[in-house]
């Protein structure tokens, strides 16, 4: 040969010990020009070729120092797995040619491999020669071979692809086929086979290898890390093709199992509160390992790349072992009555120690679990803290004549309804511990424990007192115990009936706590009523609740009862809850939707009692009679199923058959497969052996299942791969919904467009329709458009918390995704970000327009900063910000979302006012601000003197008057606080505006605007005003309003002063023969007086109601007013009002008597008032008295108070009594 051979560094591969291969390539140091030049210098080398090239056959290429000696890398005596590639010396000169040609790498390679004689087919030398010549011709390669004692070595030269194919053909034709078996995870079998067997066919056809994937699972092959078993895949063919196919299959397995989900279960619950797995989750981008801990179930789930997940599992197991060694549990014996003193929450927070109290009343061992050094500290702290408590016991079984049963009932009532919760909340420092309901049946006393810290012992007495009151207020007569309804039959129905009356009668079903207890406790609720009902009323409410259960009693009385003879052994075997027969019986009875009770070993050990309503009892009797008539467990029954359904009936390794056997507790015999081969299209007779009742159900089940199996079909739908994700849905939502809805299996292949749907024909067709409709929708709405948006405006498109982009998505029904971040190099370079919009064509266009409008709006966004002196800021903002709001409104800011006017706080040194928004808006706002500043620069400030008591009128309710003045006259009005009497009121603004504002303030707002003024001594004001009724009379009769100036507060206080009523004297008797309905009492009390000094100023103003604007027929008419007539009416009304006030003042000294009318029925007091107050007005005018009818909410609400002269009081009293008697 004329080219130097260099061996590759990697060792040759060996397959089944029969082939050894060495692959060589042309040296890169040898060029075509070098070889040509050398050939001219040494022509003799071409004339004497040697069959086996060696180093001496190669031409000399420059200095000999450039290369080391190289052994022959092939031939009969070659030794495999040794690489002899020479490396040039560092001092070697580079090889050059006189032509200066560029060096080139040859595409040719050489590959040597060895075949053991044992693995070769027995062929003659001519046959071998014929095969070699055929390979050389078919693949355009050079093939040479040598034979040694135990092997034959081949050297194949040529283009790389051709060499590999030539080698495959040589190995295939010269060697015996082999059978290789590899184990693969069972979950990977579907991927290896592919949709419709497509993947496995491709591998088999490509490498001409027969591949068989076993349906069975290898025994003892479960791997808990993979959560899977393994199955065998066998490959038959020549060893080279088998290895290539094996590599392809293992690549699929590697891809399918690259990620793992590993579950660790923490068996011991006491470790759960202390486990923290956050440190085990790695953060390596796509290679992240996620660890989740489910505290309730105790499961630790690890998700991530398989090897990393396994390593994480090992780390967590080590962590759990270390945690287990550090945790300790100590049990301390603590009497039950003191266990409640241990604050488990406090110990958990302070020492991280979990306290578990015993579940049974007899158990006094309390468990403390935590870190070894903390458990002892926690127990010590619990002991010391409990010593600081004082505990008192209250034995409520001593109440109500030592009625122990009633005391137990009260505890059940208190527990269910948390009756004592309000008491605990009102005394937060006191703990109340009720005995557990489980301990009540055997308890000889019922003791409630009350505890508190020593320094709060007084609270215990208060709580004890209230507890005694609670117990005493619920005597046995206010409860009722019902025992005639069966809880097992009607427990749910009883609860439903009693819930309707729970607001008045509480109830406790003992069956909720104790098995086979039919007792129901009813408790009458009387706490919410003002007066406790009589015992008759309480009994009536209890009986009403009891009677609501009569419909259930009727059902119970109408129930049929029947007893069957079954031996004790048969009942324990056939009818125990876990038996297959019992489950079938319960299924049959539940279909009847009735009430049924089955009691085993009742009334005798060898008897069974059935009780229920007609429908359910009839079904149960039929079942038990059939079992009695055919009690043998050796009964036989046959069922015919299609032959093609037998495999499904049996299932994988008989799993389905075993499940059916267990479900119906019967033996199922299927004829051998050999007997069925000739009748694949016919049915197979399956024999069932067992209890006849079970066999009837099994036969029905098998017939239905066989029909379902025979109806299984597969349908295909072509779905472009890009739509797979949309049809599968997030986390498989859509696919899972269809699979569950139609009981089908839907397979989406990874790299294929054909989606398969398999299952019952009806379900497959329905699922196919829905999937096709969804695909059509996705294809219609799957159009995409990419638009470029400026990176600086991306936040504006997204909006706060994504509001803007979510609104666009919802409005136009599109998906929007930014393909880059604003910080990406490409985005920073171009200044734009790509936004992808997915949806229908029209919706995409509309959404794109919306985005463009946002970008345009953002582009129009400007910022302008004004430097304004602080003294003008208040003028710009205005009182309550009303001026600033007006500025924004005038500039059109109400319809603009992205705008702002930022004015510094009063205490800030910053003078900058920042205006942001569209150019037009900013321009208008700036103009308005500059205008205000200009006006403020030309403004004047004027001080006005206003009495301190009138400052409030200038401000108005909530500052409304001041704001109106500032807005109306464009001024700034300063009113000092009430606490600053020396403060001056100032008006700042344009001179003409200040003058107008001052005029309005002085002439309209603070002017004392009244017509007459009368001073009434405060001591008799209550009588003069008739507690406000006289003021109302002036307003209604004379159109005269009364105001009180600075004495308003005092006047209101006197008019509403509480009335002192001597209840002992005036109240009548309500009991016995002397019971009264009304009582009238009169006494002399002296002239009206009050401790208040000074006068009450009554300022009278004539304010008639103007009815001129109320026109008839909806037409406006001019009404000519007679000014002189109105003035005369005004004077007359004012004179009359003043006269009436003075008369009341003159009569006050003679109003020395008070009258009290008591009424047993306060509901009749409205008869005194009359419609619209007409009757009471009539009494006041006729008797000239003060009369006060109490409200229901008054402290004393059953006495009418009268004040006046003796004659007036007597007359008024008679009129009141007359009104009550009507």
UniProtKB/Swiss-Prot annotation:
Main subcellular localisation: endoplasmic reticulum
Keyword Zinc: no
UniProt GO MF annotations: G-protein alpha-subunit binding; mRNA binding; RNA binding
Keywords: Endoplasmic reticulum, Membrane, Nucleus, Phosphoprotein, Repeat, RNA-binding
Modification sites for Phosphothreonine: 50
Record-linked PROSITE patterns: KH_TYPE_1
Subcellular location: Endoplasmic reticulum membrane; Nucleus membrane
Organism of derivation: Saccharomyces cerevisiae (strain ATCC 204508 / S288c)
Record's compositionally biased regions (Basic and acidic residues): 39-49
Modified residues (Phosphoserine): 54, 63, 85, 87, 89, 630, 1112
Record-linked CDD domains: KH-I_ScSCP160_rpt1, KH-I_ScSCP160_rpt2, KH-I_ScSCP160_rpt3, KH-I_ScSCP160_rpt4, KH-I_ScSCP160_rpt5, KH-I_ScSCP160_rpt6, KH-I_ScSCP160_rpt7
GO biological process: chemotropism; chromosome segregation; meiotic telomere clustering; pheromone-dependent signal transduction involved in conjugation with cellular fusion; silent mating-type cassette heterochromatin formation; subtelomeric heterochromatin formation
Cellular component annotations (GO), alphabetically ordered: chromosome, telomeric region; cytoplasm; endoplasmic reticulum; endoplasmic reticulum membrane; fungal-type vacuole membrane; nuclear membrane; nuclear outer membrane-endoplasmic reticulum membrane network
Free-text function comment from the UniProt entry: Involved in the control of mitotic chromosome transmission. Required during cell division for faithful partitioning of the ER-nuclear envelope membranes which, in S.cerevisiae, enclose the duplicated chromosomes.
Superkingdom: Eukaryota
InterPro entries named among the record's database cross-references: KH_dom, KH_dom_type_1, KH_dom_type_1_sf, SCP160-like_KH
Entry protein name: Protein SCP160
Biased composition (Low complexity): 13-38
UniProt membrane topology term: Peripheral membrane protein
Domain called KH: residue spans: 177-249, 634-702, 712-771, 782-851, 861-929, 939-1001, 1153-1216
Location of region: Disordered: 1-59, 79-98
């Amino acid at each position: 040969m004329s080219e130097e051979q260099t061996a590759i560094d990697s060792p040759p591969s060996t397959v089944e010990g029969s082939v050894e291969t060495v692959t060589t390539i042309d040296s890169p140091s040898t060029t075509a020009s070098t070889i040509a030049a050398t050939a001219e210098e040494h022509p003799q080398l071409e004339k004497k070729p040697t069959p086996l090239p060696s180093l001496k056959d190669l031409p000399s290429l420059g200095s000999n120092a450039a290369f080391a000696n190289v052994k022959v890398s092939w031939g009969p005596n070659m030794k495999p797995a040794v690489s002899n590639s020479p490396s040039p010396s560092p001092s070697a000169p580079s090889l050059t040619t006189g032509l200066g040609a560029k060096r080139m790498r040859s595409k040719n390679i050489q590959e040597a491999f060895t075949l053991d004689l044992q693995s070769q087919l027995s062929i003659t030398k001519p046959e071998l020669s014929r095969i070699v010549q055929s390979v050389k011709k078919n693949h355009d390669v050079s093939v040479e071979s040598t034979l040694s004692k135990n092997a034959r070595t081949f050297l194949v030269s040529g283009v790389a692809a051709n060499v590999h194919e030539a080698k495959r053909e040589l190995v295939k034709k010269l060697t015996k086929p082999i059978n290789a078996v590899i184990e693969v995870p069972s979950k990977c079998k579907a991927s290896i086979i592919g949709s419709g067997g497509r993947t496995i066919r491709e591998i088999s056809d490509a490498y001409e290898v027969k591949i068989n994937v076993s349906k069975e699972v290898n025994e003892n092959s479960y791997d808990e890390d993979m959560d899977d078993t393994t199955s065998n895949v066998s490959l038959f063919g020549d060893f080279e093709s088998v290895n290539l196919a094996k590599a392809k299959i293992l690549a699929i397995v590697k891809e399918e199992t690259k990620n793992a989900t590993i579950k660790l279960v923490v068996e011991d619950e006491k470790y759960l509160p202390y486990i923290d797995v956050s440190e085990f989750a790695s953060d390596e981008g796509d290679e992240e390992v996620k660890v989740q801990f489910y505290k309730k179930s105790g499961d630790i789930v690890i998700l991530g790349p398989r090897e990393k997940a396994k390593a994480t599992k090992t780390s967590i197991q080590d962590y759990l072992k270390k945690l287990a060694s550090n945790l300790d549990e100590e049990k301390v014996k603590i009497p039950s009555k003191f266990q409640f003193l241990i604050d488990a929450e406090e110990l958990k927070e302070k020492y991280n120690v979990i306290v578990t109290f015993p579940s049974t009343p007899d158990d006094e061992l309390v468990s403390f679990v935590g870190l070894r050094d903390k458990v002892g500290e926690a127990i010590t702290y619990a002991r010391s803290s409990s010593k600081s408590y004082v505990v008192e016991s209250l034995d409520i079984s001593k109440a109500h004549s030592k009625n122990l049963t009633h005391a137990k009932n009260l505890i059940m009532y208190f527990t269910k309804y948390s009756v004592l919760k309000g008491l605990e909340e009102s005394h937060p420092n006191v703990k109340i511990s009720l005995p557990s309901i489980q301990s009540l049946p055997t308890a000889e006393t019922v003791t409630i424990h009350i505890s508190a810290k020593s320094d709060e012992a007084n609270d215990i007495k208060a709580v004890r007192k209230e507890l005694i009151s609670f117990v005493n207020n619920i005597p046995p007569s206010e409860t009722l115990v019902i025992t005639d309804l069966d809880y097992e039959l009607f427990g749910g129905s009883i609860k439903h009936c009693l819930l309707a009356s729970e607001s008045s009668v509480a109830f406790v079903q003992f069956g909720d706590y104790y098995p086979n207890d039919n007792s129901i406790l009813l408790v009458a609720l009387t706490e919410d009523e003002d007066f406790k009902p009589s015992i008759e009323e309480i009994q009536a409410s209890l009986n009403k609740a009891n009677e609501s259960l009569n419909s259930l009693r009727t059902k119970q009385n109408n129930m049929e009862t029947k007893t069957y003879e079954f031996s004790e052994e048969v009942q324990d075997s056939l009818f125990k809850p876990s038996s297959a027969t019992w489950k079938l019986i319960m299924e049959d009875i539940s279909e009847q939707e009735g009430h049924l009770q089955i009691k085993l070993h009742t009334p005798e050990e060898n008897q069974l009692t059935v009780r229920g309503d007609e429908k359910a009892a009839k079904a149960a009797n039929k079942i038990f009679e059939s079992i009695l008539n055919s009690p043998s467990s050796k009964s036989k029954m046959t069922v015919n199923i299609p032959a093609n359904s037998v495999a499904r009936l049996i299932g994988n390794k008989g799993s389905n058959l075993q499940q059916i056997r267990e479900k119906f507790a019967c033996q199922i015999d299927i004829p051998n497969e050999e007997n069925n081969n000739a009748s694949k299209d016919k049915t197979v007779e399956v024999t069932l052996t067992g209890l006849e009742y079970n066999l009837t159900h099994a036969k029905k089940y098998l017939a239905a299942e066989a029909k379902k199996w025979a109806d299984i079909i597969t349908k295909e739908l072509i779905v472009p791969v890009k739509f797979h994700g949309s049809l599968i849905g997030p986390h498989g939502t859509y696919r899972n919904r269809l699979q569950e809805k139609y009981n089908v299996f839907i397979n989406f292949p990874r790299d294929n467009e054909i989606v398969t749907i398999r299952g019952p024909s009806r379900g497959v067709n329905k699922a196919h329709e829905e999937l096709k409709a969804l695909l059509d929708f996705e294809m219609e709405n799957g159009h995409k458009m990419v638009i470029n948006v400026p990176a600086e405006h991306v936040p504006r498109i997204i909006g706060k918390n994504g509001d803007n982009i979510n609104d666009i998505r919802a409005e136009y029904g599109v998906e929007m995704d930014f393909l880059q971040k604003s910080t990406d190099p490409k985005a920073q370079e171009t200044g734009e970000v790509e936004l992808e919009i997915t949806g229908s064509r029209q919706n995409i266009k509309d959404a794109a327009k919306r985005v463009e409008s946002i970008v345009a709006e953002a582009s129009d966004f400007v910022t302008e900063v004004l430097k304004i002196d602080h003294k003008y800021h208040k003028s710009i903002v205005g009182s309550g910000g009303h001026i600033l709001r007006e500025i924004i409104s005038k500039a059109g800011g109400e319809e603009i979302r992205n705008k702002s006017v930022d004015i510094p706080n009063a205490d800030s040194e910053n003078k900058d006012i920042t205006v942001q928004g569209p150019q037009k808006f900013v321009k208008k706002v700036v103009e308005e601000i500059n205008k205000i500043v200009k006006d403020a620069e030309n403004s004047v400030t004027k001080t006005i003197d206003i009495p301190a008591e009138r400052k409030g009128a200038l401000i108005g309710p909530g500052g409304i008057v001041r704001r109106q003045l500032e807005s109306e006259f464009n001024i700034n009005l300063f009113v000092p606080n009430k606490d600053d009497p020396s403060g001056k009121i100032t008006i700042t603004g344009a001179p003409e505006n200040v003058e107008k504002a001052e005029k309005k303030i002085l002439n309209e707002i603070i002017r004392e605007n009244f017509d007459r003024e009368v001073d009434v001594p405060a001591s008799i004001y209550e009588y003069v005003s008739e507690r406000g009724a006289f003021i109302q009379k002036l307003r209604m009769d004379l159109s005269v309003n009364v105001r009180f100036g600075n004495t308003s507060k005092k006047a209101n206080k006197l008019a509403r002063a509480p009335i002192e009523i001597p209840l002992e004297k005036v109240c009548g008797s309500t009991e016995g023969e002397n019971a009264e309905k009304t009582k009238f009492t009169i006494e002399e009390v002296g002239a009206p007086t009050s401790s208040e000094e000074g006068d009450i100023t009554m300022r009278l103003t004539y304010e008639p109601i103007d009815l001129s604007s109320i026109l008839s027929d909806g037409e406006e008419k001019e009404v000519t007013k007679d000014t002189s007539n109105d003035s005369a009416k005004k004077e007359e009304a004012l004179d009359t009002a003043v006269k009436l006030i003075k008369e009341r003042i003159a009569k006050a000294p003679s109003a020395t008597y008070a009258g009290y009318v008591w009424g047993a029925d306060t509901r009749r007091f409205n008869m005194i008032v009359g419609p619209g107050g007409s009757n009471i007005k009539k009494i006041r005018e006729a008797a000239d008295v003060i009369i006060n009818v109490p409200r229901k909410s008054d402290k004393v609400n059953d006495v009418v108070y009268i004040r006046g002269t003796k004659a007036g009081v007597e007359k008024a009293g008679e009129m009141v009594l007359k009104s009550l008697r009507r």
